[in-house]
Amino acid sequence: MKINTYELWSGADKSSVTYTAYLVEETPDIKNHNPRPAAIICGGGGFFKITDREKEPVALYFLNKGFQAITLDYTVGKDSSYPTPLYDLAKMLLVTREKAQQWNIDPDKIILIGFSAGATHCASLANRWNESILQDYFNYPKEKIRPSLVILSYPLLDFSYQYDSVVADPDNQRPTKLSPMPKLDFLTGALKTVVGKELIRENLQEHSPIEHISADTVPTFIWGMQNDDCIYNNALLDYAKKLKDNAVLYELHMFAMGEHGLSVINQNTQTEFSDYKELAIWKKLCINFINQVLDLN
C-alpha cells in the first residue's frame, strides 16, 4: 500500500487543506487489475478541528472492503464558514477524478463518507453539486463534482432546528461528553463557525443542508443515535422525510443508544472498547447500501 499526503490547493493561503491517499497498488503477489471504487472521508470535530478518530481508522476499514481511501483535511476554524468547505469537497472530487487512472479508481464510483461536521459538508455537496454556487466557482461540467453517494454519520443537517432546540433546552448549560463547554455555547459556537454570520433565521437556512435537498440529491445513507448528547437528532427524521418526498434513494438507521463520535467502533477508535460495540453493525448496513447502489456485488 502507498500512503501520501498532498496539498489540495496551490497557494500558501490554502496550504492547511490537505488530503492523504491510501492506495492499494498492484504487486507480483497482489493482482489489482480492476479499478476500485474510492471513498473520500471527512472526519468531524465541531467545525473547529478534525479528529484523528474519524480519519485513518475509517480509511483502513474501507481499504479492507475494496476501496481506495482518501482522508480530507478540509478547512476548519475561523476561515471555515460556507461556502469554503463546500469548495474543498468539490475540489477533492475533481482531483480524484483527474487522478482516477493513476490511482486505479473507477471515476463513476466515488463516494463521500462524513462524520459529524464532516457529514454536514458531505450532505451539502450531495445536495448542491449542480448549483450555481459551485458551477460558477469551478467552471467544470457539474458531473465532475457529483459524488456517487454519501454516507452521513451522526450529522448536523438542519441549522435552524439545532439552534432553536439548544436555545429552548432547559438543560443547555450542562457540558456534552465531547466538550467541557456548556452545550449552548458548544452548539451555537459551531453554528457561528460554519454560518459565518449572525444566527438569525435567514442566515441559518442559507447553507443548511436540509434546505437544499432536491430530486438531484445523490443516494444517501444516514445513521445516528436517539440519545446523542451533542446534537438534536429528530432532525434526521425530518431530513429522511424530505429525501423521500423528493424521491431520493436513502436509508436511515436511528439507534436507541450511543455516543457522538463513535466512528468505526473498533480498537483503533476507542481507548476502551466501546459499550456500544453492537452499533458497529452500521458498517455492514452501509456496505450493503453501497453495494446495491454501485452494483459492486
Where are these regions (language model features)?
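N-terminal cap/lid segment of alpha/beta-hydrolase-fold proteins
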Residues: 1-34, 201-203
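Conserved strand-to-loop "acid loop" that flanks and positions the catalytic carboxylate
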Residues: 155, 221-229
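Mobile cap/lid helix-loop segments that gate and shape the active-site cleft of serine hydrolases
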Residues: 165-212
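C-terminal catalytic histidine-bearing segment of alpha/beta-hydrolase fold enzymes
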Residues: 221-223, 234-297
